[in-house]
């Protein structure tokens, strides 16, 4: 029964792991719901501030903010939003694949790359595979604050205003639904006009201070809000991916336990049959 003992030990070990993955799945479900609430709460602000920017730009058409001016791209910047922890399936791997593809397309055109990395997994990736990381931040926790991001975002915005980079994009996972998380690369600056944006929002307001001064401040707030939205949405995507990964691990553990239990029963049955045969053989010899 030595084989049976080993199988019993494996079954006990897998059951212990199954309890852990099941608990992690339940925790991920709870965290995902909270992250979804934060995501839904911050989304209207990000959308509204863009509408205000569009109106301010129309209110002062002779002034073109640097964040709205297209220029030849010699150097591009990326703000990469990754997770701090693993055990979330292929979430980070898929994100890095999308990022590397976009970076390679730029490099083929002679464009150099600067990176701002949010999250430990992104920092580890670029430490291993290389990349010009000019700013990094990690361990934002389950409830990230926009104030935690301002410093890193400012590094990239200052680089854009100084002409050291000519385009800035944010790379993150979009939360589509519980089962789907989509890696995306979105351009932040220069600001890309949305179709019919100017036609939908015509407000007759007087601004104090003037529209130009407000626009200068709001453009920075807009970029910060977009990065914050990306972080919150990536967090929701991370928890959803972890929930699915832990559910799959729990289910696979159950299947493996069933298989091992069957093998154990067969081994035990074979041992009993052998013992009976030996007893019968001994009795016949007597």
Curated annotation (Swiss-Prot):
What is the role of this chain?
A: Produces ATP from ADP in the presence of a proton gradient across the membrane. The gamma chain is believed to be important in regulating ATPase activity and the flow of protons through the CF(0) complex.
Q: Mind telling me which Pfam families this protein's record contains? A: ATP-synt
Give the chief site where it resides: membrane
Protein name, as recorded: ATP synthase gamma chain
List the membrane topology term(s): Peripheral membrane protein
- What is the name of the gene encoding this protein? atpG
User: Which cellular component terms (GO) are annotated to the entry?
Assistant: plasma membrane; proton-transporting ATP synthase complex
PANTHER family from the UniProt entry:
ATP SYNTHASE GAMMA CHAIN, ATP SYNTHASE SUBUNIT GAMMA, MITOCHONDRIAL
